[in-house]
Amino acid sequence: MKFGKYLESQVEANRYVDYKGIRKSLKRFKSEIESLNIHISELKAYNLNNATSKINSKQPSPTTATATTTTIGISSSNGGSNLLRNSISTSKFMNLSQTPLGSSTPMPSDQITAINTSKSILESMEQLKEIQDRLVKSLTDEVSKVNDFYMEREKEAQERFDKLKIQVPLYLKSKEKQRRENEKELNDHDELLSYSESYHYSKKKNKLNNNNNNNNNNNNNNNNTTSPPPLSHDQQHLQQPEIKRINQHHAVLNLTPIKSTPLSPKQQDGSSKKEVKISLLSSPILEEEEEEEEEEDDNIHDQDPEVIEMATVYHYDEDELEEVLSDNCNDNGASDEFNGSVNNNGAGSGGGGNNNSSSELNLTFDIIGSKISKSLKEISTHVVKPTTTFFQPLGDRAKRFMSMGKQKSDEALLKEAFREYYHFLVILKNYQVINYTGFVKIIKKSEKNTGLSIGSQVMSFIESQQFRQSKKIERLTSSIEKIHSELFNNGKIRDARKQLRNSEHVSQQSPTISNFFSGVCAGWTSALLMLIYYFIYTKEFDDFVRFSSIYNVYSAFGLVLLWAFIFGIDCWVWTKSHVHYSFIFELSKNKFNHVKIFQAVTLLSVMWITSIGVYMWQSVSGDDFPFPFVPPEYNPLVLFGAYMLILVCPFNIFQLSVRKWFLNTVFRVLTAPIKSVKFKDFFMGDQLSSLVLMIVQFAQFVCFYTYDVYRPEHSGGCIRYARYFNPFISGLPAYCRLMQCFRRYYDSYDSTTGKGDTVHLRNAVKYSLSIVVVVCSTLDGFFSGDSGWHSPYRLIWVVAGVSNSMYSYWWDLICDWSIVVRPKGQHWNPFKWTLRKRRMYQPTFVYYFAIFSNLGFRTTWTFTKSLPQLTNILPSYKLVVVIGIIEILRRGQWNIFRLENEHLNNCGKFRVTREIPLPYQIRDNEN
């Protein structure tokens, strides 16, 4: 594609160089210059003839010879490029031909004629100079428009960069906070695990000593008055909420006994001690093992006192606690001393008792109690809400499942914002290069066609403009690459540039695999079509099981596949015409294109045809079918199950992102008034409006497999009840679109002016008429009966249908497509319309075809009441499918021109990148 054609395809004149408009101006200037050249050439020829006649009549004087030579020089000029240079020679000729001042001799007539001719030449030269000035002014004005637009975009780029730059420290702060939390959780887990291991080691060792010295331990328990009493099972059960409350706040206690030191008399007095039953913090593993060991032991009172001490501590008064802590609290080497204390205690117990061990044990209780007191004081400063430990994990999992796929992480949002901003900078840089190259080519073409030397004057003006001199885009690009590399690529600029330029990995499928897949599908489909052809045209379809119901189910699937195929053709047209449909639909072009759609349709069509062939074969064969696992009437249900498995498959196969986009969009359509409406939402709502027949047949499919399939074949229960629920199903898409229109009007409402965009209300009228048509059609079906066209309900239905069709047809041409506009200066004339100038498709004939064919498509609803008259051509069940096919074709045509109009609107507002919501909100008091 030539560069000039590329610039002509840029339909916004104030955005890129108006190459097409300048070419038209050059043609106009060229015609004016050519007319001036003809006039000047005639004058030169006339002067040359006069000079020649003078030479023949008399000997020319030096003055006349000079004049003749000058005149010949003028005539020898070729084109307008030398006219300005020859204007000097012409002025010399006039000065030589004028009569000297003070001379009374009248000038001859031929000299007067020469002077008048020279004046005419000078006037032509002035006109030529005026044309040159006009051409230069038109070019400089175009340069100014481009420069003004570039300055606006450059300012926008700086503002977006400032917003992104503010996000960087917030992201680093959040990441550091998350890292600290992870480290804290890891340390807490390791600490609990190490404590649990040491505790159980000492517990098992003491238990072994207890079994060997049972009698000695009982004597020690009776003599040792300072040892704590054991806890009953009920008391331990009451202490569990306190354990959980401490565990929730991560109050991890380092419980280690201190060195063996002699006790003061005040400390040896056990009367000042107050027993407080507080359970120590333990890990879930510790609690499980304690429960298992409690079940094994029949009597907890037979355990060693050091085992019981982990469940009971003693609390001192504040004075006593400070004295104990100041004298004895030393945690260095606590683990080894703890093990030694346990060993010594066990040995003393075996020898008949040890006072040092008892004192050491009491001091251990003191330190444990002091640490628990501090922890409880810290916990008391926070408000603790009791939670259930059994249902909490289930609730967290449910929340994660419900939020799956809805919100991205802060890092993913920030990366996406960086990519979109980098894409914006690349487009802006291309804008600089394209416009500068366009001006250079236009200047060359202007000098070539007009012969005027304007290059130096215009180029000097271009070089002085900001869009040529500014280097801010390069600086912003390098800055964003550096920031991205430091945040996400470990300082590697090359990797950062690769990630920023390629928003996602392009998975290119091997053409061999694609061709093999197409060949297998084509061969398999051909064989099945031959089988279906044999069954149909051998008049054996009367033997098909429940043919009328199964036909409706398979036809519904076929309509969906046809709609997908037509949509793939639309994507192919948009790709060829450079309509940015992937940006409009907010999807990746690598995963959503016509090739992917055709591949999906091929796979689903093969499954559809296979199911039909198996159903026919099984119906005809009966018990002779080689695989009689599923009855023939359940084959559509199996096909539907396979389709649903593909649609909701959670694995990253079958275009997971596109399937999620489709399901999310359909959900947003069904919940229209709740959320704001995007283009993809009301576009999908319009698609569902054209698939009403498929939706109705799907409802019959549900009714068939929940009611009719268990009853005799000709019971017809669903057919009798269909007249009651079909109107609600038929009006559901129109209702969803009506709610979307109201929501869009609500979103456009301005509280300051008290008004909203009324175009959404006018659009709501169209869908209101559709609902009225459904209501009138239902009343006609219930009350008209045998009256037919003489029934007033039938007439009301016709009036509503005609009104809906004409209003929808007008809305398509004027608003949805915008291909018909009023010419400038004639807005008052309601009968004067023309095609809009900005068009993406060629040739222009397709627009006229769309105008007239859309009117025919909009009137296909008349066939629904003409079925008795048309049954001679096609059976009624086939004619209904034909009407559905026509509606899908109309929707495919509507899609092509609707996306074109949206693309042109985006170009007009310079919407080429998405607005990514930033992860961190900035408060007003933050700088």
UniProtKB/Swiss-Prot annotation:
Sequence ranges assigned to domain SPX in this UniProt record: 1-460
Gene Ontology BP terms: cellular response to phosphate starvation; phosphate ion transport
Gene Ontology terms, MF aspect: inositol hexakisphosphate binding; phosphate transmembrane transporter activity
Keywords: Membrane, Transmembrane, Transmembrane helix
Annotated segments matching region Disordered: 54-78, 204-239, 257-305, 326-355
Pfam families the UniProt entry points to: EXS, SPX
Location(s), subcellular: Membrane
Annotated TM spans: 516-536, 553-573, 597-617, 636-656, 682-702, 769-789, 845-862, 869-889
Broad class of where this protein is predominantly found: membrane
Extent of Low complexity compositional bias: 60-78, 208-224
Composition bias, Acidic residues: 286-299
Membrane disposition: Multi-pass membrane protein
Residue ranges of every copy of the EXS domain listed in the record: 717-927
Entry annotated with the keyword Transmembrane: yes
Top-level taxon in the UniProt lineage: Eukaryota
InterPro entries on file: EXS_C, SPX_dom
One annotated Gene Ontology cellular component of this protein: plasma membrane
Claim: Transmembrane is one of the keywords in the record: yes
Biased composition, class Polar residues, residue ranges: 257-270
Family indicated by similarity: Belongs to the SYG1 (TC 2.A.94) family.
Name by which UniProt lists this protein: SPX and EXS domain-containing protein 5
Organism encoding this protein: Dictyostelium discoideum (Social amoeba)
